[in-house]
Swiss-Prot record:
The keyword Protease applies. Belongs to the peptidase C1 family. The keyword Cytoplasm applies. InterPro entries: Papain-like_cys_pep_sf (IPR038765), Pept_cys_AS (IPR000169), Peptidase_C1B (IPR004134). One of its GO terms (molecular function) is cysteine-type aminopeptidase activity. It is found in: Cytoplasm. GO terms for cellular component: cytoplasm. This is Aminopeptidase W. It comes from Lactobacillus delbrueckii subsp. lactis. The active site is at residues 70, 361, 382. Its EC number is 3.4.22.-.
Amino acid sequence: MTHELSPQLLESFSRDFNADPKNQVISRAARRSGLLEAAYNPAVSQRLNRTFSIELDTDNVTNQQQSGRCWLFSTLNVVRHNFGKANKAKNFTFSQSYNFFWDKIERANYFYDRIIATADRPLTDRTVRGYFDWCQTDGGQWHMAASLIAKYGVVPRYAMPESFNSNHSQALDMVLADKERKDALTLRRLAQADDQEKLEAARTDFLSQIYRIMATALGEPPKTFDLEFRDDDKNYHLDKGLTPVQFYKKYCATDLDDYVVLANAPDHEMNRVLHLGFEDNIKGGYPNLFINVPMEYLEDAAIAQLKDGEAVWFGNAVGRQMDRKTGFMDLDLYQLDQLLDIDSHLSKADRLATGIGESSHDMALVGVDVDGGQVRQWKVENSWGDKSGEKGYFTMSADWFREYTYEVAVQKKHVPAEILDLLKNQPIELDPWDSLI
């Protein structure tokens, strides 16, 4: 059956709209200020009061600017708060550009291997298409950042500061993606011809060119540096000639082996380990593993870690029911259904299954307000600079956390043993087009 939009049907839609006088009032407000502003609910500010019963002592916020490095910024924020606590230097900041440099090269290395491994498949194969489509994006996961830190260490921000291309990564991503896609066609042809000598030579040459691009765009990473800072008591510290790995092992009180990522993806089987191998970025690094569990496990573990004095990395759908100016995140922030007289409600599972729900952004939990055992609100450290929210910090309702948070990275000691035991089971391999991408 076909359904043509006839003039008569369209005219009936117009009559329905004009039959209710309030539609014209709503339309004038929406056209003047936009749908979101017209639907804004000021009562939210009365509930979210920016006071927290548990709150970490943090300082300056970071700014990823026009780049998709939230996963890296939020992971480094967790690590730097641990560093600040251990070394009494709460305003110390790591270089995000340093790890970003190595991430791009490691992604290219993994991409070339995936292309070679699937050379016998057509370019129209859905997995191959996924490799090409997602070549050299900025996005990532906790385990990707952990892999970079474990292999390359970290450096202070002053040792490799931000550049235009790290802050505004679109052009760099385009150059890398275009080059790697062209390289992929060459590697496929050589792999199909089973010419291993030429294949390895081409692969190595391509990686050398990727390094050159990154060194041109960001500068070469330091091999050693001098650690120099004043702590919160104004005491001077100097440690010369550290490598990035030495610095991390000596000064950073974060053992990455101690962490696990809990996920709440109700469109997937519960109490199973999921592997997002498509986003693994380092050969021999941490695989992107999630334990998919009910939401209360994520909430309980996050609270326990905050009580223990440590920030919590979390992946979420920040674009939903969030006001960048105030930093409020609440399910009733924009009452669009009431404004437009519609019902758009979907369950968390249905949002994921239909593509509406996605873990599009990563931030750090640095506080929580618990009253009588019930969570009221969370304090969130974003990486959008100090001009958004309350000097860069956002306030998130308990319901928003439950509906729009999909992952938290927490220490294993905060997770029940029966949940950790699930890691002993074979993980479910997720496709490149899975809803958790």
